[in-house]
Amino acid sequence: MSDITRALVVYESMYGNTARIASAICAGLRQSSPTEIVPAYRAPTVIPGDVRLLVVGGPTHAFSMSRASTRQEARNQHTVVMPTETGIREWLDMLTADTTSTSGRRRAQVDVATFDTRIAKVRRLPGSAARSAAKVLRRLGFRVFLGSASFFVDESTGPIREVEIERARRWGEELGRLHAGSATAA
């Protein structure tokens, strides 16, 4: 196996807004390290051995990560642009129960960061897909590296403003820079 490590961004998106945020975060991360981006429905259930940073994000539904029922409700209200059967909640449930990755590394050697999208006009309401995902990842033995980030859409279907896309790219750059610095110090 190569000594080159990489980041993996796993996201859920129904209307394309969270996918745009994930892509911007990925672009920022690529300033520091090779980075792969994959939707939750195609994400590996065992974290590859060369991944040292896992970034997970999705839309906030009913104050948390989406559920099959909240995704169905969203499908009933609007046309979705991406498959919605597997969200980040289900993907996290499918992560292998084994505490090691395919290379035998402990999950605690993989840093994680989480993000979500939320409707701007209810930004002050409690609950967040990112914070919920971080709790699950911590329980699974991953090391939460940086606080969660929320990015705001005007309505549930969007649009997402360019300022939020740019903010996501900068967050990805910062995340990559901080992670590269912590890996060097370790």
Predicted regions located by residue number:
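Short histidine/acidic/glycine/proline-rich micro-motifs that form metal-
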Residues: Y15, R118-R124, V153-E155
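Glycine-rich phosphate/pyrophosphate-binding loop and the adjoining helix
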Residues: R138-A186
